[in-house]
């Protein structure tokens, strides 16, 4: 535990050192002086001319929301088309065929919504062109969308008596050009230095040092599996010394995968694969990359509203929630897995099932907490192999709404929605009209807040109920009982909150889950974005109220406690009954 606390302290210290200047820089990027890099400003102006965009023309919230939805619909159509046309497109050295319609739909929605849920195995499904032009591009654009939306909300708080909240195309372009691209280049070069691969070679077949013996299913002349009288597959022993090593442009996709809190990797093993995450140092940088922009945006928020203490208060709330749950996760994983203990397995170092030996329990547990606190979903250990309580932590973090740092942009605007709820509750307690940052919280804002908070629980709980009742949903559950229910609950929690990680024991690459989770991902993204932009518009139009003796300070310890309490209260009331049927019941049964 001491090693974990030391690594956690170092991680948070380095994160703070990097996030503060980045946050200040982003405040300039989305202000009047985007950058001193004149060549980037020239590129920016060129992009506006090519696209026919007037960067000086600002938008109301409805126009802004339509632009957000339009660009994401076009992105989803492009990714879908790339997958379906894959056999006839270049950069496909393995000759992969077209992806099925339901899987193409799921993947297109997944990457456009910043979820990166993957029901397929990347190294055996997607060509290099599909990975680069489709998935990696959406890693940039989905992150830029989140940044643009939160910047619009911040402008709503910062402006008064205004009808506009900015220009989406400008925010979208600047987020990509000035923030995501430069950081991705730096991180990608670092990953290459650590051993992550970056090439366009065909897959390599190599001879292993030792032969591998495995059970190979027997088939008849038509290729159908042969089964015995009990219906079990008939197998025969086979031995091989050949292994296929996947190749590809990995480091470049890995960088934006982490920085954009996307999470979807080129390989099925994700960041547990040595070609994606080769060393403990690379692993540390991956964890830093996940939280870097979400943490920096808190400083951007403080700078743009003219009170840096506001950003510190939000960051403190996020950090306290994160540290408490990270320590609990580590405690759970340092304990032996009861199922393995019954088999006499040595677990002196904790639960190592599903973890890479080069990372161990400490780095794996920290990664688990970070990737689910943010809406990243990348994994360096298998979440389905966590202990019952170890699996409870990432699921609960996701169900809190991805507001503990959260996704790029989405984490902060989600936490600001809870901040509005917190001041509303405080206003009810003292009998005053609530206000936040000098803006009065009225009926419309509370309606939008309620929608933004209630959408994801509705999608999660209804989706889970439908899945366990429908035959198509039950067919994907291979682990019966409480753990099987946990797998389904985790899948819909991950999809609705745009995380993308999974309890991978669930067989989710089926028409039922591909369509159901695709719908949930889309609604979970845009049914929150639209209410947030609506609030941005109404806040921008309001007059700023003067601070009085009765105004609740939203930059001190009391507000931090109120904000944390609001997040936990909503999460507990909404999900504890479902969690009691899953990971909690599983833990008590052992």
Curated annotation (Swiss-Prot):
It is a multi-pass membrane protein. The chain crosses the membrane at residues 3-23, 63-83, 134-154, 177-197, 284-304, 312-332, 359-379, 388-408, 411-431, 450-470, 515-535, 558-578. Its main location: membrane. Disulfide bonds: none annotated. Residues 217-244 are annotated as: Disordered. The keyword Transmembrane applies. GO terms for cellular component: plasma membrane. It is found in: Cell inner membrane. It comes from the Bacteria. InterPro entries: KdpA. Keywords: Cell inner membrane, Cell membrane, Ion transport, Membrane, Potassium, Potassium transport, Transmembrane, Transmembrane helix, Transport. GO terms for molecular function: P-type potassium transmembrane transporter activity; potassium ion binding. The keyword Glycoprotein does not apply. Part of the high-affinity ATP-driven potassium transport (or Kdp) system, which catalyzes the hydrolysis of ATP coupled with the electrogenic transport of potassium into the cytoplasm. This subunit binds the periplasmic potassium ions and delivers the ions to the membrane domain of KdpB through an intramembrane tunnel. Belongs to the KdpA family. HAMAP family: KdpA (MF_00275). The system is composed of three essential subunits: KdpA, KdpB and KdpC. This is Potassium-transporting ATPase potassium-binding subunit. It comes from Ralstonia nicotianae (strain ATCC BAA-1114 / GMI1000). The gene is kdpA.
């Amino acid at each position: 535990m001491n090693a974990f606390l030391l690594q956690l302290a170092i991680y948070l210290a380095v994160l703070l050192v990097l996030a503060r200047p980045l946050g200040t820089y982003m405040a300039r990027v989305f202000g009047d002086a985007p950058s001193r890099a004149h060549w980037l400003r020239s590129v920016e102006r060129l992009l506006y001319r090519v696209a026919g965009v007037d960067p000086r023309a600002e938008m109301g919230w409805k126009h802004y929301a339509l632009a957000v939805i339009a660009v994401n619909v076009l992105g989803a159509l492009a990714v879908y088309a790339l997958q379906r046309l894959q056999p006839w497109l270049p950069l496909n050295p393995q000759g992969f065929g077209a992806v099925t319609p339901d899987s193409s739909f799921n993947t297109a929605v997944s990457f456009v919504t910043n979820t990166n849920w993957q029901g397929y195995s990347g190294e055996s499904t997607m060509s290099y062109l599909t990975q680069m032009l489709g998935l990696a591009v959406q890693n940039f654009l989905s992150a830029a969308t989140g940044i643009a939306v939160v910047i619009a909300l911040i402008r709503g708080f910062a402006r008064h008596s205004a009808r506009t909240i900015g220009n989406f195309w400008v925010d979208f372009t600047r987020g990509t050009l000035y923030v995501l691209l430069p950081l991705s280049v730096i991180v990608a070069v670092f990953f290459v230095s650590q051993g992550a691969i970056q090439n366009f070679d065909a897959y390599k077949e190599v001879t292993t040092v030792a032969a591998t013996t495995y059970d190979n299913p027997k088939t008849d002349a038509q290729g159908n599996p042969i089964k015995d009288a009990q219906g079990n597959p008939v197998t025969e022993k086979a031995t091989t010394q050949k292994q296929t090593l996947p190749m590809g442009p990995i480091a470049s996709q890995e960088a934006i995968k982490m920085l954009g809190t996307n999470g979807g990797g080129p390989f099925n093993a994700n960041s547990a694969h040595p070609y994606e995450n080769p060393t403990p140092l690379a692993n540390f940088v991956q964890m830093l990359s996940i939280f870097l922009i979400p943490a920096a945006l808190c400083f951007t928020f403080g700078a743009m509203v003219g009170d840096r203490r506001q950003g510190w208060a939000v960051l403190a709330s996020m950090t306290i929630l994160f540290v408490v749950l990270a320590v609990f996760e580590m405690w759970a994983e340092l304990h032996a897995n009861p199922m393995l203990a019954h088999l006499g397995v040595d677990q002196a170092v904790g639960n190592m099932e599903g973890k890479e030996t080069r990372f161990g329990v400490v780095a794996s547990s920290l990664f688990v907490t970070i990737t689910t606190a943010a809406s990243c979903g990348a994994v360096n250990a298998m979440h389905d192999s966590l202990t019952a309580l170890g699996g409870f932590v990432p699921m609960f973090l996701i169900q809190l709404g991805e507001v503990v740092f959260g996704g790029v942009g989405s984490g902060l605007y989600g936490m600001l929605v809870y901040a509005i709820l917190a001041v509303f509750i405080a206003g009810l307690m003292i009998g005053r009209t609530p206000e936040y940052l000098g803006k009065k919280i009225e009926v419309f804002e509370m309606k939008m807040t309620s929608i933004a908070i209630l959408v994801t629980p509705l999608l999660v709980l209804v989706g889970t109920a439908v899945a366990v009742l429908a035959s198509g949903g039950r067919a994907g559950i291979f682990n019966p009982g409480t753990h099987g229910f946990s797998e389904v609950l985790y899948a819909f929690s991950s999809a609705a909150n745009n995380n993308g990680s999974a309890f991978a024991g669930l067989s989710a690459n089926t028409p039922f889950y591909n369509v159901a989770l695709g719908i949930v991902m889309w609604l979970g993204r845009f049914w929150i974005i639209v209410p947030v932009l609506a609030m941005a518009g109404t806040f921008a139009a309001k007059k700023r109220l003067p601070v009085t003796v009765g105004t609740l300070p939203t930059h001190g310890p009391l507000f931090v406690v109120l904000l944390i309490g609001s997040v936990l209260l909503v999460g507990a009331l909404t999900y504890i009954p479902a969690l009691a049927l899953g990971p909690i019941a599983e833990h008590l049964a052992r």
